[in-house]
Amino acid sequence: MMIITHKKKNALAVVVSISLAFAIGGLAGQVTQGAIPGWYAQLNKPFFNPPNYIFAPVWTLLYFLMGWAAARVWLKGRHHKWGKTALYHYGAQLLFNGLWSLVFFGLHQPLGALVVIIILGILIERSIYWFRLVDRPAAYMLYPYLGWVSFATLLNLAIFWLN
């Protein structure tokens, strides 16, 4: 008979949660990579557009923080309505995160992607709100993500405007 300790359950929750965030990021990255050398390279971009090599390390850190934050909420609040609500919002924003790459890079639709990223920002803000009720450090872990997505929203708007 195998006994799973409390520490092992916690570690498993963290690994699964971070892996889920990276899975969404990996799928989004697959869509993105194909568009970078062709369609995206031809777009007019604003002066504040970062170089392409910046995006992968930033997103790697953000997906790690997102997954870790979600695991903290899962472990502390999965049996409480606030915890469940927080995780529903988190799941929705994770789907919109992946959807943005599909719409922007896969479908080449900056305007449609702008709509998606605005909804994404709202869902991140709501996730932070609910995470804070369950685990304040988990909410703080999402602030860099909200900041980056806010910047990406401005970048998306500028690309739409310039093209």
Q: How would you describe each model-predicted region?
A:
Residues I4-K9, W74-K84, R132-A139:
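Membrane-interface helix-boundary motifs at transmembrane edges
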Residues F104-Q109, E125-A139:
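Membrane-helix boundary connector in multi-pass membrane proteins
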